[in-house]
Each structure stands twice: as structure tokens, then as C-alpha cells.
Amino acid sequence: MSVNASTLVADNLADAASLEGLPENVSAGHAAAGTEEHHVDPTALGMTATAWVSLAMVIVILLLLWKKVPSVIGASLDKKIASIRANLDEAAALRADAEKLKAEYEAKAKAAAKEAEEMLAHARSEAEAIVSQARVDATALIERRGKMAEDKIAAAERGAVAEVRAKAASAAAAAAGALIAERNNAKADKALIDGAIDALGNARF
């Protein structure tokens, strides 16, 4: 690699000399000897400042290449790019997971809302059925209680009528007995008894 670097430096210096129209082994001082008006740049070791700057740049580039700085920089950049790409992939994965979780949550929320609506509708239906059945039961109970009350009233009325009739019959019997006792004496009773006996005897025969 050092041979190639030396060759490269020599080629660059030769190109610089040819561009200036000077021989490769001729210094700037000898070239300026042909004219008095030509400005002579200061030289060191037969090289102008521009040549030294070019040489320094070439040396720096060669050092960078020798130390593998571009490859290190490239590797660092590749590593950074890989890290950024990994972060982007992770962010994309996290976003996909978030979207999935969001979709699952929305689906569960919709299912829960639907289930709540169904439960509410079922509860309303059951409540309406219970109220309707309660009305029917209340109506039937009222009718039964009314019937029982009517039956009790009718029974009480019949009992009262029977009691009144019994009392009336007892009073009538007592009055009839008193009237008979008042109008008939023992002689008349004997005649009635004899007549009744005779009537019974005739009826047998």
C-alpha cells in the first residue's frame, strides 16, 4: 500500500508540474529566471506552498486510508442505519400491536354494548311480563275475594231468613197453641181425640 501511495504522490506532482508548463526536475526559481516580471513564489525543498498543501492533503488521505477510517466511518454509519432501521421496525411493530389492541378493544366494547342492550331488553320484557301477570293475578284475586264476600253475604242472608222463619214459625205455633187452648176445654179435646181415633179406624178398614 505504501508503494502505491508513493506512486500516487509522484504522479500528482508530475501532473502539477506539467500543468504549470515546467519540467519535472526544474524548480520555480529556474523557471522565473527567463523574465523579470514573473512573480516567484517562495519554495521549500524545491516545492511551492501549493505543492506542499497538495502533498499534505494526499498524505492525510493516505493516512485515513491506511487507518481504514472510511471503513470505520462506513461501519459506524451502517451500524447507525441498522439501529435506526431496527427502531423503525420496532416502532412499526408497536404501532401494529397498538392497532390490534385498539381493534380488539373496540370489538369487545361493541360486544359489551350489544350484550348490555340485550340484557336491558330482556329485563324490560321480564318486567312487563311480571307486571302483566301481577295484574291478571290481582284481577283474579279481586274476583275470588268478591265471590267469597258475595257467598258469605248470601249465606248470612239465608241464615237470617231461616232464623226469622224459625222464629216466626215458633211464634205462630205458640200463638196457635195459645189460641187452641183458649178456645177448647177438656171435653172438647176428648171429643176431638175420639173423632180422630174413629177416623183412623175407618181409614184402616
From Swiss-Prot:
Swiss-Prot/TrEMBL keywords: ATP synthesis, Cell inner membrane, Cell membrane, CF(0), Hydrogen ion transport, Ion transport, Membrane, Transmembrane, Transmembrane helix, Transport
One Pfam family hit: ATP-synt_B
Annotated compartments: Cell inner membrane
Transmembrane segments: 45-65
Function statement: F(1)F(0) ATP synthase produces ATP from ADP in the presence of a proton or sodium gradient. F-type ATPases consist of two structural domains, F(1) containing the extramembraneous catalytic core and F(0) containing the membrane proton channel, linked together by a central stalk and a peripheral stalk. During catalysis, ATP synthesis in the catalytic domain of F(1) is coupled via a rotary mechanism of the central stalk subunits to proton translocation. Component of the F(0) channel, it forms part of the peripheral stalk, linking F(1) to F(0).
Matching PANTHER family: ATP SYNTHASE SUBUNIT B (PTHR33445:SF1), ATP SYNTHASE SUBUNIT B', CHLOROPLASTIC (PTHR33445)
HAMAP family: ATP_synth_b_bprime (MF_01398)
Name by which UniProt lists this protein: ATP synthase subunit b
Lineage of source species: Bacteria, Pseudomonadati, Pseudomonadota, Alphaproteobacteria, Sphingomonadales
